[in-house]
Swiss-Prot record:
It is found in: Virion. GO terms for molecular function: structural molecule activity. Belongs to the potexvirus capsid protein family. Keywords: Capsid protein, Helical capsid protein, Ribonucleoprotein, Virion. Pfam families: Flexi_CP. Its main location: virion. Required for genome encapsidation. Forms ribonucleoprotein complexes along with TGB1 helicase and viral RNA. PROSITE patterns: POTEX_CARLAVIRUS_COAT (PS00418). This is Coat protein. Transmembrane segments: none annotated. InterPro entries: Pltvir_coat. GO terms for cellular component: helical viral capsid; ribonucleoprotein complex.
Length: 201
């Protein structure tokens, strides 16, 4: 007989691990680890290099266009560009960085060091620690927690500033005909002169 709902004990024992298409999976990370070993990054140093990549991207941006200079601290013969290139061969760089977003967040808070481009990115000083483009990983339950958890959760201002920055990054003035009237972009205004255009999907 088919059971459509569980009994009390089965329900109490039911477990679920959060997954998100915007965050790297363990299988994807293992694929990257294998590729990295092939260029001289030991498996034991995977986190060190992953964290260095995420930190560097948090100072700039994490995208297919990201080109990182310098070498891996724990594997000096390997360039960050090469390490990032192998990440991109498996999944988008930002998706990889989101996996480590909570570690980036904690480190920057504990060292009082906001992302380098926070002012250029038009973030208010009160939200400067949220000024990295994979910040949404801090609130994504599929991204792992640091051993001691978050130092603190993001404030409403930080969440709002990051969301605004995300929409601003999407908005482009182009003659593509893709127009948005989303309140996040127009702030409720309807002036024709304020129309914002989005890139084609």
């Amino acid at each position: 007989m088919t059971t459509f709902v569980p009994d009390a004990k089965t329900w109490a024992d039911t477990a679920y691990t959060a997954q998100s298409e915007s965050v790297a999976t363990a299988e994807e990370l293992q694929s990257i680890a294998t590729l990295w070993e092939g260029i001289g990054i030991p498996a034991a140093n995977f986190f060190d290099v992953a964290f260095q990549l995420a930190m560097r991207c948090s100072d700039g941006h994490a995208s297919s266009l990201t080109v990182l200079s310098g070498n891996c601290t724990v594997a000096p013969t390997v360039t960050l560009k090469a390490a990032a290139g192998l990440v991109k061969a498996v999944l988008p760089l930002r998706q990889f960085c989101r996996y480590y977003a909570k570690f980036v967040w904690n480190w920057r808070l504990s060292h009082d060091l906001p992302p380098a481009n926070w002012a250029d990115s038009q973030f208010p000083a009160e939200a400067r620690f949220a000024a990295f483009d994979f910040f949404d990983g801090v609130t994504n339950s599929a991204a792992p927690q640091p051993p001691d958890g978050l130092i603190r959760p993001p404030t409403e201002l930080e969440l709002s500033a990051a969301q605004t920055a995300k929409f601003a990054a999407l908005a482009r003035v182009r003659g593509s005909g893709f127009v948005t009237t989303a309140a996040e972009i127009t702030h409720g205004r309807a002036e024709v002169s304020r129309t914002m255009l989005l890139s084609p999907p």
